[in-house]
């Protein structure tokens, strides 16, 4: 499977990316999405990708979550093995946004992505 397949990207989706610094990935998203934004999250996004390089960046997840479709997923993409940001902090940011974690994917050689969705009661 490609990274895009592991992340659940399908043609025709509404996709948003918030401060994600991966030009090739953003180009791929633009090519597959029905609607795409890399500035602010689109309402009813099927997928939202939030980039976080340090713990303070995790607040972006809470700001982006209200734009997520009820059956959508929010991915937090963060550096692997860095002191600036730990997995537990990423998990807590998703929880504070009202989401539950369901999956982890190796996004690239340097970054990991954690997937969050709305709890079943909110879908």
Language model regions located:
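Conserved beta-strand segments of the P-loop GTPase G domain that flank and frequently precede/overlap
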Residues: 18, 48-53, 77-79
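Mid-chain, well-packed structural core segment of small domains
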Residues: 56-89
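Short, compact, well-ordered microdomains
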Residues: 79-97, 102-106
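Class I S-adenosyl-L-methionine
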Residues: 99-123
């Amino acid at each position: 499977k490609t990274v895009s397949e592991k992340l659940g990207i399908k043609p025709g989706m509404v996709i948003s990316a918030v401060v994600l610094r991966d030009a090739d990935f953003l180009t791929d998203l633009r090519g597959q999405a029905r609607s795409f934004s890399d500035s602010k999250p689109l309402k009813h996004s099927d997928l939202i990708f939030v980039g976080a390089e340090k713990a303070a960046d995790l607040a972006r997840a809470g700001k982006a979550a209200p734009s997520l479709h009820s059956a959508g997923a929010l991915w937090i993409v963060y550096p692997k093995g860095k002191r600036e940001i730990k997995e537990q902090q990423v998990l807590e940011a998703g929880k504070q946004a009202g989401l539950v974690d369901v999956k982890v994917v190796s996004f690239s050689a340097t970054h990991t992505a954690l997937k969050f969705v709305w709890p079943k009661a909110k879908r």
